[in-house]
């Protein structure tokens, strides 16, 4: 089951407590994610971003950096730059794009807090463990992607 922070917010901690889930992003992971999420929340009526919001931000930011580095909007040249450049932004301090286009980055196993553990709105997760990038995705040689030669 795919569960987002917004789902937990809608369910409430009383209902969602104890649920374990994986996410690639949580607003309260570190100082950088907290600062980015604060700016997001100011524009979104106090709502905190989900991993989808953060992922789109990282993807578009990386794409624009790749266009700049390629000096063109040619899709093949931009895709090549996307694979060559490190993904580095407020969400992902260091990630890479594989030959098949998959972003290699850690994921996180979280457990939803009990109501009494939360300090306020959107303080919903406690980190159980970080899942390293190499464990979070299928190995390149098992994917059968036509981009991999």
Annotate each predicted stretch with a short phrase.
Residues 84-86, 90-149:
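Solvent-exposed, acidic/polar segments of extracytosolic/periplasmic ligand-binding ectodomains
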Residues 10-17, 41-43, 90-91:
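Ligand-binding "clamshell"
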Residues 1-22:
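Extracellular/periplasmic bilobed ligand-binding domains
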Residues 1-3, 22-26, 100, 112-113:
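Active-site-proximal beta-strand/loop segments in catalytic clefts of secreted hydrolases
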Residues 26-86:
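Extracellular/periplasmic ligand-binding modules, especially the Venus flytrap/periplasmic-binding
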Residues 8, 29-30, 117-120:
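Short, solvent-exposed loop/turn elements at domain surfaces
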Residues 12-15, 74, 100-103:
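Extracellular/periplasmic catalytic domains that process cell-envelope and extracellular macromolecules
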